[in-house]
Every structure is written in structure tokens, then in C-alpha cells.
Amino acid sequence: MDLQDAINQRHSIRQFTDKPVEKKMITKIVELAQRAPSWVNSQPWQVYCAMGDTLQAIKNAYRDQDIAGNQGNSDLPVMSREDWASQTQDNMKQWRHGIVHHFANFDEAHEKMTNASNTLYDSPVILYITIPKASPDWSIFDAGLFAENIMLAATAYGLGTIPTYNSVRFPAILHQTLNVPDDERFIVGISLGYSADTTINSYHSERRPVNEILHFN
């Protein structure tokens, strides 16, 4: 698969099969992703791969937090969507509109999306990306470049992905379960696996026309 195909075919997968992903494949994906650029080649990222019993322990602990009514407290701050810029609010509104019309009605869309999110998409693997707490904001940008490389590489190898806030909203659980040092902070979790043939996975979000975001001077 060439780069253009990988970029166009990558989209968020919200339901995975139970087919396991081999460690050898995960290693290939992460090794390829390491070619991402970073400030002075700082390469601030670490990757913690949760699978099997470890991932199930995380899912169980998250479920317990949800039952207790805890909302989570991710290492990166979360801003109310009402405070986002108008253009980004419009984009999110269009995304929600597209999701609703992809299903029979709002109730079905809400149920499917909520269940998928609450179960961490039933993914067999989550790759947790961290950076040192002693990092500039630019390291978050670098981690994003690295994360995109992971998702493109996974697509090229026939796997699906979705990067989520939901996977990192209880960092204390992750530090304990994954044995992550306290001086690292969680940036994102990328669910990884083989895509299930379901309605929720056939949705592809739209993008703004390029002339609305590209400005020649």
C-alpha cells in the first residue's frame, strides 16, 4: 500500500474483532513510526502496549470507575466544546450530524457510539503513548506526529485504529497497571486490531474543502 492509499483509507475503527495481533506485527508498526520527526530529534515518546489480561484489567477498572460515576481526569486538560473556536465547533457539529444519519435514528447512533466508547471498542490492543512530564508543549506535537505514523503504518499492514481520550482518562489506573513511572504523562491511547464488518465502522467522516483551510499569500 502506498502512502496516499494509507492516508485515504485510515479512519476511526470503533469495533474490532477478537483476532489477536501478533507482537511481531506491533513491533514492526512502532519501529516504522519511530521515523517521525521531533524537536532536535528528542524522540520524547514511550509506548506501553496493553493486551490480554493487562488490557482486560484496565477495562475492568475503567468500568468500575464509570459505575461509580467518576468522569476521569486525563493528564492533558480537557476544554468544554462550547469554548472551542467556531470553525472547530462547526466541524464537530457536522460530524455528529453525519453519525446520526449513518444509523437509523439518533437513539441508535447514541447507543452504538456510547457502548463502543465505554468498552474501549473491544480492541485486543491499546498502545499508550507517554512523554516525560518535564517536556515542552512541542513534545505533545511530536507525540502527535508519532501517533499518526503508528496509525498509517497499521493501515498499511491491514489493521484498524482509533486514537481516544477515553482510553487515557484515568491515568492513575494506567500508571499502576502498566508500571509507568510517575514522571511520565499519558498523551493518548491508540486502539489497534482487525476491523469488524459492522455499520459503525463503515462511517467515514467528511473533511472541509481544501480551499477553506489553505491560504496562499
Q: How does the language model describe each region?
A:
Residues 1-217:
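Acidic, surface-exposed loops and disordered segments
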